Amino acid sequence: MAVKLREILETIPVYRPGESPDECGLENAVKLSSNESPWEPPASVVAAVQEAALELNRYPDYYKEQLCIDLASCYGLDPAWVSVDNGSGSLLQDVVRIVCDDGDEVLYSTPTFAAYEIDVKLAGAKPVTCPLDDSYRYD
């Protein structure tokens, strides 16, 4: 039995990550476009990950409540106004799904993060772009 995929997927380009410095024949280059750090994680971070790994057999706090409380306290905010996710792409998907209805228009500047158009289309909304000028400002 074949699985029928949503037609909208035909309009969305396949993600192609940028080439690595090795693929380009570059030495001592840093690839910033993939949000990769050129430095190894600090020992304290490695230790925290190792400690957390001891609880991998348990579901985490789904709503990340304690982290939201801690961040809110640090910045003087109400925890209800703090959202934590697996990255900006994941958070963007959540926001678009929560806010947009079919046919809504979502305005954003171009050039921009490639995920904007994809997430807007997947939510059934219509992307509307506003190009930036040569100084990366709105006209």
Task: Name what the model sees in each region.
Residues 57-139:
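Conserved core of the PLP fold type I
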Residues 1-58:
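N-terminal "arm"/small-domain region of PLP-dependent enzymes with the aminotransferase-like
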